[in-house]
Amino acid sequence: MIFVTLEHILTHISFSIISVVIIIQLMTFFVHEIPALSDSLEKGMIATFLSITGLLIIRWIYSGHFPLSNLYESLMFLSWSFAIIHMIPKIWNHKNKNYLSAITIPSAIFTQAFATSGLSTEMHESGILVPALRSHWLMMHVSMMLLSYAALLVGSLFSIALLVITFRKNGKLVVENQNLLIGSSFFDQMDYLNFNENINVLENPSFSSSFKNYYKYQLVERLDYWSSRVISIGFSFLTIGILSGAVWANEAWGSYWNWDPKETWAFITWTIYAIYSHTRTTKNGQGANSAIVASIGFFIIWICYFGVNLLGIGLHSYGSFILS
């Protein structure tokens, strides 16, 4: 009973903290960036990560198995994965971490909100594992797949943002909000201009067009950079996850590959991002061309993760779920 109580407490703590974090992020997005708030944002994400980590450990202890046996647990692990990805630039001391936080923080809160409020209460309970899941491969295979989903989703969202900006007909690029352009935590600092001169420069018609085109180019370059880096990490995790799943399938079902719906869509997902990786190596593959492939992959992942579960058929049918 005490474990269940602790789990509920940590669930509410993590969701409350990340809710405050996203409010802080919106404040720094629409208003001029405040260093103290940015520091609080980072501390909040660390606290969220620790809370979800504690929640998963407690659930592991009282259930007796790694907490990845149903959709609720996988969603909480996915939210934890978004927090991990968010902290990678901080670990590497990367100066442009604000780009990543603009994707990871909303992803983490929406995932956790759906896990806690969108699923039936029965899905929150940790039941007895079906025989096929009673294996040491559970931790390896499922954790790698979920880490890959998190990284690939984040990278694909960068690509979608890149396409929106690239093909936007009006080149205003949210210039109406001067604070957003000058000091936004999402679009980064414009270090090559003196802050006191920014407003006058933007109001100069002769400079405005070239300035916005240059800024648009810089923004697209940043989005392309982050998209390729995060997707490369996710693709590595996906490859490891599929290979470990094949070994596990051979132990459980006597065959490395059975082409059931989950395996088929996992293979389609891997193929899409393999095409993305290949496209990046071609002469004109960077930028919008590879971003189109990654954007397709974004929807393929959701089909693989959620869509197949809705069918409730195949060797992975124990992953089906009921909405509340």
From Swiss-Prot:
Topology in membrane: Multi-pass membrane protein
UniProt signal peptide: none
MF terms in GO: heme binding
Compartmental location: Plastid, Chloroplast thylakoid membrane
GO cellular component terms listed in the entry, alphabetical order: chloroplast thylakoid membrane; plasma membrane
Top-rank taxon: Eukaryota
Transmembrane regions listed in the UniProt entry: 17-37, 44-64, 68-88, 99-119, 145-165, 230-250, 264-278, 291-311
Predominant place of localization: plastid
GO terms of biological process kind: cytochrome complex assembly
Keywords from the named record: Chloroplast, Cytochrome c-type biogenesis, Membrane, Plastid, Thylakoid, Transmembrane, Transmembrane helix
SUBUNIT field: May interact with Ccs1.
PANTHER family in alphabetical order: CYTOCHROME B_B6 PROTEIN-RELATED (PTHR30071:SF1), HEME EXPORTER PROTEIN C (PTHR30071)
Function: Required during biogenesis of c-type cytochromes (cytochrome c6 and cytochrome f) at the step of heme attachment.
Family under the similarity heading: Belongs to the CcmF/CycK/Ccl1/NrfE/CcsA family.
Protein's name in the database: Cytochrome c biogenesis protein CcsA
Organism: Lemna minor (Common duckweed)
Organism ancestry: Eukaryota, Viridiplantae, Streptophyta, Embryophyta, Tracheophyta
